[in-house]
Structure formats: C-alpha cells, structure tokens
Amino acid sequence: MSDFQREQRKNEHVEIAMAQSDAMHSDFDKMRFVHHSIPSINVNDIDLTSQTPDLTMAYPVYINAMTGGSEWTKNINEKLAVVARETGLAMAVGSTHAALRNPRMAETFTIARKMNPEGMIFSNVGADVPVEKALEAVELLEAQALQIHVNSPQELVMPEGNREFVTWLDNIASIVSRVSVPVIIKEVGFGMSKELMHDLQQIGVKYVDVSGKGGTNFVDIENERRANKDMDYLSSWGQSTVESLLETTAYQSKISVFASGGLRTPLDAIKSLALGAKATGMSRPFLNQVENNGIAHTVAYVESFIEHMKSIMTMLDAKNIDDLTQKQIVFSPEILSWIEQRNLNIHRG
C-alpha cells in the first residue's frame, strides 16, 4: 500500500466515523443506581482524581485514540490537543504506524505534544509492531503511556487488513517487558472477556481499555470500504462496555481497567466507574464537537461534562471514584442473564 493510499484510508476512517450515530440501545440503560434522597456531601467535596499505580489523571475522562497520518488528521489532533491542554484531560493519539513508517507523517502526531507540552499523552501502536517500533512510538510523543490496540475484527473486515494473529500475545508480552511507561491493551469497540484478562495477566499486563461495542464501529467502517459491502452482518459483533467491565471484575485488583466504547453522557461515565473502571475514554463525541463546533465549544462541553459528573456523584453520596464502586446497582434481566451464563462473580456494596 502506498503512502497516499494510507493517508486516504485515515481520512476515510474519520469521515465514516463522524457519520455514524450512537447505538439506539445501550447496555448503560440496563443498569440503574438506587437513589438515596439526602446526600451527606456537597458538590465541592467531590474529588474526581483518577489514581492508578503509575498514572494520575486530574479527571477520570480522557480523549481516546482516534487518528493521525494525514494533513486533515493532523489538524484534528492539533485541535484536540488544545482542548486537552485547556481542560486538563489526558489524550491518546491514533495508531502511529504511519509516522513510524514514514517520518514525513510524524508531525501529524507530534503536533499533539507541541500544542500540549505538559499534558498527559498516550501513544498508540498495533499488537504486531516490533518492540523497537513500540519504543519509538513512546519517544516520538514523549508519551506517559502506550496503548496497544487489538483489533482483529477490524483487520478481518478491512480489505487490506492483517490475516495473521498467532504472534500477537507473545509480541505484547515483549513490549510490556521492554517499554518503561505503562502499556494499555486497548480494544477498538468489540469488548473484552474474562479469558482475555487471564491471558493478559499471565504476561504481565497491568492496564486495559475494554472498549466495548456501542460507539465507533470499525466493522461498519471497514465494511463501507469493501467493494461489495458484504460483511454488514457482523455489525453487532462483540461485548458491550457494561458486559466487558463485568467480565473484568475478578481481575480489577491486579489490572487497572479503563472503559470506553459507546459512552454518551456523564451518567454513562459514572456507571463505568461504578463497575470498576479507573477512567473513561471517548472518541467520537470529542471528534464531532471539535470538528463541528470548534475548540472553545468543545472546551465548554468538557467542563460541563465534568460538572455533571460531580452532580451525579453528589446524588450518589460518593466523594471519589472508589466510593462509586460501593454504590447499589440494579441490573436488567438481560444483564443478569449475561452474568449468570458467563459465571461472573459480582459482589455489590
């Protein structure tokens, strides 16, 4: 594939993603908090700091991996980096393969660090990149963490995608052992299982982003790029973010879990934190805001989002993220069926 074709693919991904809409039905709507009428705290008591063994984020919300590798996506990364700088959010860039392959593309990613020199930035590579390239990806952005995206459904629907996956787990293990910053194993919208969590724990992984279905749909994106558009029947493949978080419960004391995939509102973010996530990521909401409404409007959107999270936590009488995990939740029969059939041991406070 030529550099021009790769740039074109990056732009196509963004165009199709922006045209997608949220899923009509979300598993976040299949779980409810139990309301208690009189909080014992005030809004100003709320501490939204997200603390993990290696990363401290001012807020448990981050701009998740999206793009880079073309002039248009450089402009997007520049604007998102300004939003991150002005709001204190962490930010992940999209796959840096283009920059690692062609130095001319490096600026489409490094613009994020240029615009946000003191901020927290996650670099991003695929599960098949050599260790040396993973190290380069971290150095390129002076990144505080490295996402490794695992995206086999996307690759298999992508006309020019990868068809070989046997080495992925061993390669991830090698990267984890060599890279000095936290390595986050990130799905891309298909969710995670307890079996995967077991395998990742065995190779020393300490961070995952479950990225469940319900948000940006890469099966749909790649199917749109197929000549016959003949794999649309896989559109609903995978676990939701709620199901994925429930799958991780037994591993949350050993692996820091981040949640993304289909988060629409501050309430969805709070529900994710209550299910054990340490932080929540969103992509398309930020992309649409910054492209359609500009930087200032997106900054205001983030500030409002954070304030709404504080209001919800006050209603729940939860001073911090840890308190949220002790709050009572009622699940729908469908979610309870998933828990039962998957033999998940879920204990609520």
From Swiss-Prot:
The keyword Lipid biosynthesis does not apply. Mg(2+) binds at E155. Keywords: Cytoplasm, Flavoprotein, FMN, Isomerase, Isoprene biosynthesis, Magnesium, Metal-binding, NADP. Pfam families: FMN_dh. Its main location: cytoplasm. GO terms for cellular component: cytoplasm. It catalyses: isopentenyl diphosphate = dimethylallyl diphosphate. Signal peptide: none annotated. GO terms for biological process: isoprenoid biosynthetic process. Transmembrane segments: none annotated. Its EC number is 5.3.3.2. GO terms for molecular function: FMN binding; isopentenyl-diphosphate delta-isomerase activity; magnesium ion binding; NADPH binding; oxidoreductase activity. It is an enzyme of class 5 (isomerase). Its cofactor is FMN; NADPH; Mg(2+). It is found in: Cytoplasm. The keyword Ribonucleoprotein does not apply. Belongs to the IPP isomerase type 2 family. Involved in the biosynthesis of isoprenoids. Catalyzes the 1,3-allylic rearrangement of the homoallylic substrate isopentenyl (IPP) to its allylic isomer, dimethylallyl diphosphate (DMAPP). Homooctamer. Dimer of tetramers. This is Isopentenyl-diphosphate delta-isomerase.
